[in-house]
Amino acid sequence: MITEALKKVIEFKDLDEKEAEAVMKDIMSGNAKPTQIAAILTALRMKGETIEEITAFAKIMREFSLKINPNVPKLLDTCGTGGDNLNTFNISTATAFVVSAYVPVAKHGNKAVSSKSGSADVLEALGVNLNVPIERVKESIEKIGIGFLFAPHFHPAMKFATPVRKELGIRTVFNVLGPLTNPANANYQLMGVYDEKLTEKLANVLKNLGLKGALVVHGSGMDEITTIGKTKISELRNGEIKSYYIEPEDFGIKKAKLEDIRGGDAEENAKIIGEIFEGEEVGAKRDIVVLNAAFALYIAEEAKDVEEGIKLAEKSIDEGKALKKLEDLIEFYREG
């Protein structure tokens, strides 16, 4: 099947849903040779992947993943694409703990691909054991309100594509598929993307995948809601998608410079997150976490608007709730 699909894609013709599903099934089941995987990924990148193709790929990846179904009323993920190459600290990981004081979070993530520190790297540096059984992850979401879904544990079929991705060294559709394939089936999502042009497209994919609410965001070169300039947001709510731009000043947050929110390696980023949660860092780094958490609480229908979300996010940090969630997760996974 992959050969027929390749013939089509190199002529810049789009795959229909069934064809795209068959391609991903071939890759995930080990039926596609590495050269074929490299060829189809490169051809798709040159053609430009459609909403229908990305949706089909994500559905099959979800089928091949190991899944958990935490017994919680709502579930949020803050997983983004990464790959913005700006070397900020792990904002979406810090955001996950702040938000988990109010909404259960299934944080999907991995080790760094292009940055110095992925979410898994910084969590390890903070003392979180990544090698826990997946059932333990389900329990931590139910009992603590947060769990970390380490991608390699939940997506074993990715072993066929990962070496090819590394050797290719270019962005492919897999860069966006990670955040679209939460193994706990989170029904709300704050998803940062590395390119502003992707926000509407991926909001449509999340709609096709059945999410209740999602914000797909890109902020002035960052795969986060930014405080250094404008952020483009595509919002999925009640089956409708609308796009708009925001700036930090709209919400009374001071504009920052990129150097104010830069991170370093995993150890340095863990130190920054600790300082935010312990109340030692009260400047730009805290501000950007608060703003992202506020939008996450808004889209998860926990805050009626972003302003209320900001108050809740500040309370989570100031009252030590975010720090407690981190400490509880470290302890819970240590036993695992």
UniProtKB/Swiss-Prot annotation:
Keywords, sorted A to Z: Amino-acid biosynthesis, Aromatic amino acid biosynthesis, Glycosyltransferase, Magnesium, Metal-binding, Transferase, Tryptophan biosynthesis
Database matches in SUPFAM superfamilies: Nucleoside phosphorylase/phosphoribosyltransferase catalytic domain (SSF52418), Nucleoside phosphorylase/phosphoribosyltransferase N-terminal domain (SSF47648)
One biological process term in Gene Ontology: L-tryptophan biosynthetic process
Any GO CC annotation of this UniProt entry: cytosol
One MF annotation (Gene Ontology) recorded for this entry: magnesium ion binding
Residues binding Mg(2+) 1: 92, 224
InterPro entries assigned: Anthranilate_Pribosyl_Tfrase, Glycosyl_Trfase_fam3, Glycosyl_Trfase_fam3_N_dom, Glycosyl_Trfase_fam3_N_dom_sf, Nuc_phospho_transferase
Residue numbers binding 5-phospho-alpha-D-ribose 1-diphosphate: 80, 83-84, 88, 90-93, 107-115, 119
UniProt key word Transferase: yes
Reported cofactor(s): Mg(2+)
E.C. code: 2.4.2.18
Record: residues binding anthranilate 1: 80, 110
Pathway involvement of the protein, from the record: Amino-acid biosynthesis; L-tryptophan biosynthesis; L-tryptophan from chorismate: step 2/5
Pfam families for the chain: Glycos_trans_3N (PF02885), Glycos_transf_3 (PF00591)
Catalytic activity: N-(5-phospho-beta-D-ribosyl)anthranilate + diphosphate = 5-phospho-alpha-D-ribose 1-diphosphate + anthranilate
Family matches, as Gene3D superfamilies: Nucleoside phosphorylase/phosphoribosyltransferase catalytic domain, Transferase, Pyrimidine Nucleoside Phosphorylase, Chain C
Amino-acid biosynthesis found in the keyword field: yes
Cofactor binding description: Binds 2 magnesium ions per monomer.
Record: residues binding Mg(2+) 2: 223-224
Function: Catalyzes the transfer of the phosphoribosyl group of 5-phosphorylribose-1-pyrophosphate (PRPP) to anthranilate to yield N-(5'-phosphoribosyl)-anthranilate (PRA).
Family: Belongs to the anthranilate phosphoribosyltransferase family.
Oligomeric form and interacting partners: Homodimer.
Protein name: Anthranilate phosphoribosyltransferase
Gene from which the chain derives: trpD
